[in-house]
Amino acid sequence: MKQSKVFIPTMRDVPSEAEAQSHRLLLKAGLIKQSTSGIYSYLPLATRVLNNITAIVRQEMERIDSVEILMPALQQAELWEESGRWGAYGPELMRLQDRHGRQFALGPTHEELVTSIVRNELKSYKQLPMTLFQIQSKFRDEKRPRFGLLRGREFIMKDAYSFHADEASLDQTYQDMYQAYSRIFERVGINARPVVADSGAIGGSHTHEFMALSAIGEDTIVYSKESDYAANIEKAEVVYEPNHKHTTVQPIEKIETPNVKTAQELADFLGRPVDEIVKTMIFKVDGEYIMVLVRGHHEINDIKLKSYFGTDNIELATQDEIVNLVGANPGSLGPVIDKEIKIYADNFVQDLNNLVVGANEDGYHLINVNVGRDFNVDEYGDFRFILEGEKLSDGSGVAHFAEGIEVGQVFKLGTKYSESMNATFLDNQGKAQPLIMGCYGIGISRTLSAIVEQNHDDNGIVWPKSVTPFDLHLISINPKKDDQRELADALYAEFNTKFDVLYDDRQERAGVKFNDADLIGLPLRIVVGKRASEGIVEVKERLTGDSEEVHIDDLMTVITNKYDNLK
């Protein structure tokens, strides 16, 4: 394709709000154009890359007998009310109503809709298992869209849904999808690591995320260097081994702590280590207030709280609620209280006595507070995030951290949707049973960004061979010169029969063409320049920067060999 005919609006400067390298490069190389916050158009080069990604996804889905369908993005509220998610999903669900006042949502996922499609069709165990997938735009009303395609309000996704008669069948499909996802990410050129994860708003009993390692990743991966252990930090268990630091019990004492609001400020004020401070936070669990205690250097993990209490209906109490409940602001909370409120403490609080806690009075704290004498803990548990260097739950070693971008996730849904939506089948005994389900998503547009995050240098994108928008970049340095133009035209005609060629025939300076070529990042470059009359051209590899002069008689052989050896 001639570059003069392709819409590639490269930029010299990008908006300052473009934080991620992938966002900057996709804008700069003319692949995407922002319409408004979190919403982008995919221009010709990006569309070609997306087509290559989706072709790989389709191949791998068909390999495991997953069948493609296409469902509407617009979903009626009644389906979401059946599952209970219309009220539970939160403000991220894009809602609208038609002229008749009927409520709809622009789907972020399609569990409800696909369940409604099959519930009166998959009637017998003989029709199972069945796996359906689609590739479609999804919508999420992000509070703060950022990082370009990585956190947008409209995004492209491959979502698949499987239906089963028993858990063994679900396990098999889950493993098939897990392996298919591993192959997909390897094929598109992403270093992605599967990690144990939380199922979030989708629900289910078991899930893995596929995380593309990246410095700008919004998720932290906890992993072992001695085993295959890997988990999202939200799910990483903290191993508690008692390490009591008990000293002689001292009398409780109330002290003034003016303008002290954080655990670190309190530690500095008292001249004590922050890990000897105990923080108190108040949560509402199914409408009931509770206190949760952790040591000063630890952070409460609300995902673990949801798992511990078996409910998603957990939220941090607001400042007004806290003041009404205890008479003090959040920085002064403590467990010594004359109100009926259950107290839960992280396991590691047990290692301390003579605690330092808030006095439930602004500007004051209590020192030498002791469990059993001054207050009681209802239950201890693992309520916090793991720290780097702590022991891992599989016994393999210590926790190491890496940042990652979630590009895919697989879920075992069980009967969460089929029970609430009455999707049943007849088993081999003729009894009605709820369909057992799995769901599996890949962020296609996120994958595009993740590829760029992991495959770029200071000059631009470096496309992996499998997804590159074109195989070769043919550049005529000066098309006004007959020998250069004629040779470039001849090479374009020859190589276009075997490769996808982007032919830069523009009337631009050589520097502009070379800068754009580096920015766009096609794997191989053929430059027709001053030695055209001798039949000599330059061949350059984008990844290594290696270049050599080649006679046109040998060019097809050289290019074919180099292309075959590309990753």
From Swiss-Prot:
InterPro entries: aa-tRNA-synt_IIb (IPR002314), aa-tRNA-synth_II (IPR006195), aa-tRNA-synth_II/BPL/LPL (IPR045864), Anticodon-bd (IPR004154), Anticodon-bd_dom_sf (IPR036621), Pro-tRNA-ligase_IIa (IPR002316), Pro-tRNA-synth_IIa_bac-type (IPR004500), Pro-tRNA-Synthase_IIa_type1 (IPR023717)
Reactions the enzyme catalyzes: tRNA(Pro) + L-proline + ATP = L-prolyl-tRNA(Pro) + AMP + diphosphate
Broad EC category: ligase
Compartment(s) where it occurs, according to its Swiss-Prot or TrEMBL record: Cytoplasm
GO molecular function: aminoacyl-tRNA deacylase activity; ATP binding; catalytic activity, acting on a protein; proline-tRNA ligase activity; transferase activity
Main localisation: cytoplasm
Endpoints of the signal sequence: none
One annotated Gene Ontology cellular component of this protein: cytosol
PROSITE patterns: AA_TRNA_LIGASE_II (PS50862)
Swiss-Prot/TrEMBL keywords: Aminoacyl-tRNA synthetase, ATP-binding, Cytoplasm, Ligase, Nucleotide-binding, Protein biosynthesis
CDD domains cross-referenced by the UniProt entry: ProRS-INS, ProRS_anticodon_short, ProRS_core_prok
EC number: 6.1.1.15
Annotated GO biological process: prolyl-tRNA aminoacylation
Domain writeup: Consists of three domains: the N-terminal catalytic domain, the editing domain and the C-terminal anticodon-binding domain.
Protein family membership: Belongs to the class-II aminoacyl-tRNA synthetase family. ProS type 1 subfamily.
NCBIfam families per UniProt: PRK09194.1, proS_fam_II
The protein's role, per its UniProt record: Catalyzes the attachment of proline to tRNA(Pro) in a two-step reaction: proline is first activated by ATP to form Pro-AMP and then transferred to the acceptor end of tRNA(Pro). As ProRS can inadvertently accommodate and process non-cognate amino acids such as alanine and cysteine, to avoid such errors it has two additional distinct editing activities against alanine. One activity is designated as 'pretransfer' editing and involves the tRNA(Pro)-independent hydrolysis of activated Ala-AMP.
Quaternary data: Homodimer.
Record's protein name: Proline--tRNA ligase
Organism phylogeny: Bacteria, Bacillati, Bacillota, Bacilli, Bacillales
Name of the gene encoding the protein in the UniProt record: proS
